[in-house]
Regions:
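N-terminal exported-region signature
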Residues: 1-142
Length: 142
């Protein structure tokens, strides 16, 4: 998938799993020897509905930045943790950036709705509840 990656792509569903087919909306863990810029080819994705399960989920992004407070859910008002990105360790983020994956813990199964059309918080917006829990450790790819 990514010739310069030094690991396979890992998805997450209660544990890490090797993935050979990447699906829009979901996040994946890949390891590279050095920082690099990757070009993605395809159609722009301005909205995405992501199925999530109770507990930690690794989600993807859309083609434009999105403030996490504008993410909607089904059921409405789904409780989530803060969103975490990874940069030599987990960091709480305020926005979902294109081409990156993010961790979020949810209180129940449902759907997260990421849309560039979301301009104001709606009654279906998620409810972010701060937690001290951190996402799962990265997969062992040594």
């Amino acid at each position: 998938l990514y010739p310069s990656a030094i690991s396979k792509a890992f998805g997450y569903s209660t544990n890490y799993q090797n993935e050979t087919n990447l699906v829009n909306g979901y996040g994946y863990w890949l390891k590279f020897a050095d920082a690099e810029e990757i070009s993605l080819i395809g159609e722009l994705c301005d909205s995405q509905t992501v199925n999530v399960t109770t507990g930690w989920n690794l989600i993807g992004s859309i083609s434009s930045p999105l403030d996490v407070n504008l993410i909607e859910s089904n059921p409405h008002g789904l409780n989530t943790s803060q969103f975490y990105g990874y940069d030599n360790g987990y960091k709480i983020v305020d926005a979902i950036e294109p081409g990156r994956g993010y961790w979020v813990k949810v209180s129940q199964a449902g759907q997260l709705i990421l849309s560039s059309q979301s301009l104001v918080m709606s009654k279906s917006a998620i409810k972010i509840v701060p937690t001290n829990d951190l996402p799962p450790k990265p997969p062992d790819v040594n």
